[in-house]
Amino acid sequence: MADPQTVLARRVQSALGAAFGPEYRDTDPVIRPSQFADFQANVALALAKRLRRSPRDVATAITEHLDISDVCSKVEISGPGFINLTLRDDWIAHQVHDLLTDERLGTPVQESQNIPIDYSAPNVAKEMHVGHLRTTVVGDALARILEFLGHHVIRQNHIGDWGTPFGMLIEHLLEVGEDSAEAAQLKSDPNAFYQAARAKFDSDEDFADRARRRVVALQSGDAETLRLWRDLIELSKIYFNRIYRKLDVTLTDAHLAGESTYNDMLGPVCDELAEKGLAVVSDGALCVFLEGFTGREGKPVPLIIRKSDGGYGYATTDLATIKYRVEQLKADRIIYVVGAPQSLHLRMVYETARQAGWLGNAEPIHVQIGNVLGSDGKILRTRSGAPVRLMALLDEAVERASAVVAQTRPDLDEETRAAIARDVGIGAVKYADLSIAHDTEYVFDFDRMLALNGNTGPYLQYAVARIRSIFRKGGIDPAQVTGPIQVTEPAERALALKLLDFGATVVQVGDTLEPHRLCTYLFDLAQTFTAFYEACPVLKADRDEVRNSRLALTAVTLHTLVKGLDLLGVRAPEQM
């Protein structure tokens, strides 16, 4: 089964080849939804100048060669040369009926690519805050969607596990004891551990000296220092995984690829760039200067790959990372789900890698993540000005959802209410994040997120629960519904057409890397189903064939909403 626009495009392209020659067969037929029909082909206007004919003459020639009577009930030319295409009701019904037994719901399997996706990337011994929410949620949704489309997705959690702060962290760990309550803070409140280490570093010169020496020992590979460093990472992993389980994302320890992974590559990367003449010494530092990257006064902006003291920075690690992902992971696309402020840095890294010849045919892509704002329009922070702790935010979401569930469903047992609150609270936060274009900022608002109306997670979860209740009320298993489907009422037709858009929407998200498009589709589908349910009785339909058809449309809607939410990483509770 193909979506209507794809079917129509192929037929119009065949007509183009027949009417004007094979060289026109691959022309974009410009199929768009129409207010006067189901779709319209606008290609005649685009071809008129090239063919030196009026758009209407071009449209007439296309329709004369258009073999489409099995798909369309009406083909009309309107205006200057629009070709209006109205689909046959029986064709629509047949296509939707096929979805009943199609687990992919019309989504094609694409030619597989190797796609590393770099997302989440928290720092060892530091709390994950609200700034980590969007990269984690958006990155995970993209990973799920691209896998569903048939790609080999390689999740890469580029944690901050190296650098000068580890000197003070290791020394603090030694002072408090590896088995102490203070060390255990790394599992639940890593900021407390980090801040205690920082306070000692700032106030105790002897401690600061030991911390600096410990950094040297770490970088030189001292065995005991490396053991302590690994302990810090192991304790932090426990904390990371608590967050990931709470958020219901697919990241595991197997996906960790921290900064330290690439340590052995940093020197060779600098040497190779210098040998190729891309890197030069400037003020004692080894830098790459790229054409087109200038500051406010027109001065070249350097990409510093080795500092004047011989140390390496983020740029060096990022260059080593991209080299590794192309050469070792055989990447076709490399997706970086990273904050928008990193745009300049990443563009310079990509261009350096390209000029060094490391990219080959691989395409690096920056999925820019906008900031999460408070009600004052500024970056969301606590009253004290600190970043909002992600775990605290998620706990509050579940608590708020729990209060609503307790009020609306006192008939349910406590365990069931807790499960619903968890799914609704976490789902609301994730969906709010995903429903807005990833590169835009948005205001974090619990009331809006948890609302049962509008384009929200709870609205869609409620739509799913409502549909499931229809089948429970009828004593029917939606997986056993067989139809056949007939499309006679306008509301049935509108729902059927919307269901046929799912596969094309998923493909579009995979191409654009914009999950909010799937959110918009699911919201539209839920609204279209509501209109259908109000206009077309399902369980109380007056004839068996009508009842069976509407049950089939309802079953496909249920499967589509559940699959769509699953691709976004949002659970759909059995009841609300």
UniProtKB/Swiss-Prot annotation:
Belongs to the class-I aminoacyl-tRNA synthetase family. Keywords: Aminoacyl-tRNA synthetase, ATP-binding, Cytoplasm, Ligase, Nucleotide-binding, Protein biosynthesis. GO terms for molecular function: arginine-tRNA ligase activity; ATP binding. Its main location: cytoplasm. A motif ('HIGH' region) lies at residues 122-132. Its EC number is 6.1.1.19. InterPro entries: aa-tRNA-synth_I_CS, Arg-tRNA-ligase, Arg-tRNA-synth_N, Arg-tRNA-synth_N_sf, ArgRS_core, DALR_anticod-bd, Rossmann-like_a/b/a_fold, tRNAsynth_Ia_anticodon-bd. This is Arginine--tRNA ligase. It comes from Thermobifida fusca (strain YX). CDD domains: Anticodon_Ia_Arg (cd07956), ArgRS_core (cd00671). GO terms for biological process: arginyl-tRNA aminoacylation. Monomer. It comes from the Bacteria. It is found in: Cytoplasm. It catalyses: tRNA(Arg) + L-arginine + ATP = L-arginyl-tRNA(Arg) + AMP + diphosphate. GO terms for cellular component: cytoplasm.
